[in-house]
């Protein structure tokens, strides 16, 4: 084995002691300096770029997501309920569990009738831009196509502006089955909670039916195009015959209430306009109609929607970001596109206010005059209308009869101080400067500047004049709607003209069926500020295709003021005022009247709104809001008791928190 020779170290030259000291100090400094330079190099070489930061962030999100998903799947199913109960206290049993313990069982078949926008719509035929969307939901679900291809989506969701039916080459149809409207979007229930509770006492698809329809169409056109009314008639007859002859309980919601009013006239009318069921069909097949949030007499919100494509929340957003909503930024679906699309939906005209000034009031009066708006929740279950002495506000009364006012001063002025200049004779024709509006045609372009100014100079519009206003600003749309809907009050219900289907969804121009054993319920929420009248102004934006907008600066800081962001509020469920939801069952149909010749029993059940106490309660079990009320335990229990064989006396007759009976007495209508 070879030897390893070590090299002899070289000897250092001797140095003087003084030099040794200096050398030692330098040697102590050099390692320190070298470590600093090494640290600088490592820092410079390790500096993160933007891509590194993004990757790190995405990695953290993914790891956190997978960790939370692991915990969610690992924890017991009862853990979320345990946490909720520890924070809020024990949860009450759902109505289905409670009534099952009481021994209630499924008896009468139940039919659900969804309202506007809550039912899913899917594509069956479309243009090239919609490739890959066959039988995919265009409305409901995730709404993914709104973001991916907004203009294509608007084109396919619009109807033909002349016929109110399908445009050439496009077929969009209602989703069928209970899944059509159980959830509007993932996690946002509509009918799902009611369906689940009914299942607890034995209901299933053989005795539950979702009467889905294309809610964009006029009611009669759902039969012309899809035979929806015929299928509803056949399904009700089938369920009654296969359930031992037990009559059906009908549960319509929102616009579905008007749709079923139309159906009750259609089913008994002779063919070809009607279903040919005969005058006793409703008496034979229907036990009760339990209307939820029914806009029997229309909603002021429909006027604002057709006039300026706004409601309260949209108006606030438009005021904050006018450039985004009033111009076609990045080719997004902005306000003009919304108006172009919704004005092709005939169904929106079904919810315009009915009864004119007789029902909704005039320049100096309204049924709700003296109503007090409350900023804070009242004690002892009081609603806002009860806050003042004898339900009368100490402040100057709100003129709810003025549905549209141009300026806050006009809304508050005495009738003698208002100088109207009639808009009906104004000459149209001078073009609006913004010629890009032709790409998003809304009929305002054809009015001209003179016509637009004439509308503002008329200053104030009551409910009856608001219909005239819409005829002026959108004559083609309203002409199409006039063939399907009417908004008046019948003088003689025996007149043969009321056999026309356009009157069938107006309870003031039709009779209820001859079915004395049938019951009609009006179930709705109260205690939430609800749109009743609007303060408008001319839109000064040169880029806007919509010349009018809600004047959001018309506002009163007082917490108890009824005027907020250009909107006068009244009691209701946030969408439907109490007057519209309750008047027919409170007075016009109560007992034997010309509108209810057989004396069908009517009941009012109001549910005082109680918002969820915290986020863990979701949308709440005591909500009175227009859609959230579908999860209200008290409402669900009332419906289930009637479906299980009960009647109005079993659920406590009327339950009223608002001033509906007092307000109804102020309406001078021949009964």
Swiss-Prot record:
Member of which family?
Belongs to the AB hydrolase superfamily. Lipase family.
Per its UniProt record, what PANTHER family does this chain match? LECITHIN-CHOLESTEROL ACYLTRANSFERASE-RELATED
Superkingdom classification of source: Eukaryota
Question: Where does this protein come from, organism-wise?
Answer: Arabidopsis thaliana (Mouse-ear cress)
**For this UniProt entry, what is the primary localization, expressed as one broad class?**
membrane
For this protein, what is any one GO molecular function term? Answer: phospholipid:diacylglycerol acyltransferase activity
List the protein's name. Phospholipid:diacylglycerol acyltransferase 1
Task: Provide GO CC annotations from the record.
Answer: endoplasmic reticulum; membrane; plant-type vacuole; plastid
The annotated pathway is:
Glycerolipid metabolism; triacylglycerol biosynthesis
* Reactions that this protein is recorded to catalyse: a glycerophospholipid + a 1,2-diacyl-sn-glycerol = a monoacylglycerophospholipid + a triacyl-sn-glycerol
